[in-house]
């Protein structure tokens, strides 16, 4: 009798995606981050659901409802900090996942890559709206500053900002709609992730060498289920260490103060995972120019497949490209550091230099280096 997993329509679908899926035999631990992102999303949805049971999206009670969750709800503090630090873990995995895609040339799967970029934008929007919900000082002022950026759009900007706010400032209407969107978006992210996987399984996974692995495939289960399980253990270890030992390490002290529209914090900054984009935004003195640079700093990922001029797919055997890649990583870390610093010299100059280097590496140096390597390898 044929196994039920190969007969039942639903089980058959799961079987083809996670059990009998032919996978390259040489994929490294860098390929673990896809499953870890799925785990992070599940953690966020489950903890978020429990938080939503106790949270109130009203300006007068939002801050105290979060305090109530931490003090009075059974293990409320654990759920709250799992959710807050789970977002940080989500972004760490996301950046690693994108970094792996860039290094090993996974961006040549155009549909998978572009859905991934849409996913990145959606996750960033969700995280931003989630940061507003505790209604602390940084929540309020972060929401005010970031939504105000849309006023840079010519002609319709001001009207658009007031439409998003639901009034003439960030207030009850803004908080209520942000809560509604923050609740629904993770389910949209889950649907997009399924489309992402659907496109990936059309082509099959890439591998570190960047060459076709059709002649050497192994079943996903048990080899990669065990390998993914190791990644899951490491991720949970890091997450629980953060939650149980220093839950506020990645937060902002200003968010322990209830939102006050009459008192501006000395230094407004978003969560750490947005700091690189925030630094690029601040490095341009013009408001519209800054907003365009901010959007393009993420949107540039969609151009990477078209800027890929190398004959080899992966960077595994291309040392010059590897040097540029690690320079880009160092540049992004510099931008993250600068985004958290006050707007004064020398930070302004460093931020502007790092922003120029970021676009320079991706748009000019990478394609030229690829062409040079083709010449050196006589391709």
From Swiss-Prot:
Where this protein primarily resides, as one coarse class? mitochondrion
Key words, A-Z: Electron transport, Heme, Iron, Membrane, Metal-binding, Mitochondrion, Mitochondrion inner membrane, Respiratory chain, Transmembrane, Transmembrane helix, Transport, Ubiquinone
List the GO cellular component terms: mitochondrial inner membrane; respiratory chain complex III
Swiss-Prot/TrEMBL cofactor(s): heme b
Tell me the residue numbers annotated for binding a ubiquinone: 201
GO biological process terms held by the UniProt record: mitochondrial electron transport, ubiquinol to cytochrome c
Q: Which residues bind heme b b566?
A: 97, 196
| Location in the cell | Mitochondrion inner membrane
Keyword Membrane included in the entry's annotation: yes
Q: Where does heme b b562 bind?
A: 83, 182
| InterPro entries according to UniProt | Cyt_b/b6_C, Cyt_b/b6_C_sf, Cyt_b/b6_N, Cytb/b6-like_sf, Cytochrome_b, Cytochrome_b_C_euk/bac, Cytochrome_b_N_euk/bac, Di-haem_cyt_TM
Taxonomy, superkingdom: Eukaryota
Comment on bound cofactor: Binds 2 heme b groups non-covalently.
Q: Where are the transmembrane segments?
A: 33-53, 77-98, 113-133, 178-198, 226-246, 288-308, 320-340, 347-367
Anything else of interest in the record? Heme 1 (or BL or b562) is low-potential and absorbs at about 562 nm, and heme 2 (or BH or b566) is high-potential and absorbs at about 566 nm.
State its role: Component of the ubiquinol-cytochrome c reductase complex (complex III or cytochrome b-c1 complex) that is part of the mitochondrial respiratory chain. The b-c1 complex mediates electron transfer from ubiquinol to cytochrome c. Contributes to the generation of a proton gradient across the mitochondrial membrane that is then used for ATP synthesis.
Question: Family, per the entry?
Answer: Belongs to the cytochrome b family.
Oligomeric state and interaction partners are given as:
The cytochrome bc1 complex contains 11 subunits: 3 respiratory subunits (MT-CYB, CYC1 and UQCRFS1), 2 core proteins (UQCRC1 and UQCRC2) and 6 low-molecular weight proteins (UQCRH/QCR6, UQCRB/QCR7, UQCRQ/QCR8, UQCR10/QCR9, UQCR11/QCR10 and a cleavage product of UQCRFS1). This cytochrome bc1 complex then forms a dimer.
Q: What's the name of the protein? A: Cytochrome b
């Amino acid at each position: 009798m044929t196994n039920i997993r190969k007969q039942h329509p639903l089980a058959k679908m799961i079987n083809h995606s996670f059990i009998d899926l032919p996978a390259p035999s040489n994929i490294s631990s860098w390929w673990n981050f896809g499953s870890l992102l799925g785990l992070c999303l599940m953690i966020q949805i489950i903890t978020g659901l429990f938080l939503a049971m106790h949270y109130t999206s009203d300006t007068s009670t939002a801050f105290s409802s979060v305090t109530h969750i931490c003090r009075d709800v059974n293990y409320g503090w654990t759920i709250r900090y799992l959710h807050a630090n789970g977002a940080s873990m989500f972004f760490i995995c996301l950046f690693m996942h994108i970094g792996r895609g860039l290094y090993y040339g996974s961006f040549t799967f155009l549909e998978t890559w572009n859905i991934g970029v849409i996913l990145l934008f959606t996750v960033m929007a969700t995280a931003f709206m989630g940061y507003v919900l505790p209604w602390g000082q940084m929540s309020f002022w972060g929401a005010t500053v970031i939504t105000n950026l849309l006023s840079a759009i010519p002609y319709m900007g001001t009207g658009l900002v007031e439409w998003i706010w639901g009034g003439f400032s960030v207030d009850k209407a803004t908080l209520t709609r942000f809560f509604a969107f923050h609740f629904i978006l993770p389910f949209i992210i889950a649907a997009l992730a399924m489309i992402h996987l659907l496109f990936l399984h059309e082509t099959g996974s890439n591998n570190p060498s960047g060459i076709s692995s059709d002649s050497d495939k192994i079943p996903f289960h048990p080899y990669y289920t065990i390998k993914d399980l190791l990644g899951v253990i490491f991720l949970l270890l890091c997450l629980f260490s953060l939650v149980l030992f220093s839950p506020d390490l990645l937060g902002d002290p200003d968010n322990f103060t209830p939102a006050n529209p009459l008192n501006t914090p000395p230094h407004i900054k978003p969560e750490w995972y947005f700091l690189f984009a925030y630094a690029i935004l601040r490095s341009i003195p013009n408001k519209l120019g800054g907003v365009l640079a901010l959007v393009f700093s993420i949107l540039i990922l969609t151009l990477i497949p078209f800027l890929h001029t190398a004959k080899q797919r992966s960077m595994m055997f291309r040392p010059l490209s590897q040097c540029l890649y690690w320079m880009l990583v160092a540049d992004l870390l510099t931008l993250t550091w600068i985004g958290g610093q006050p707007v004064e010299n020398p930070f302004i100059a460093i931020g502007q230099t790092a922003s120029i280097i970021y676009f320079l590496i991706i748009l000019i140096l990478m394609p030229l280096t690829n062409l040079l390597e083709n010449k050196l390898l006589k391709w």
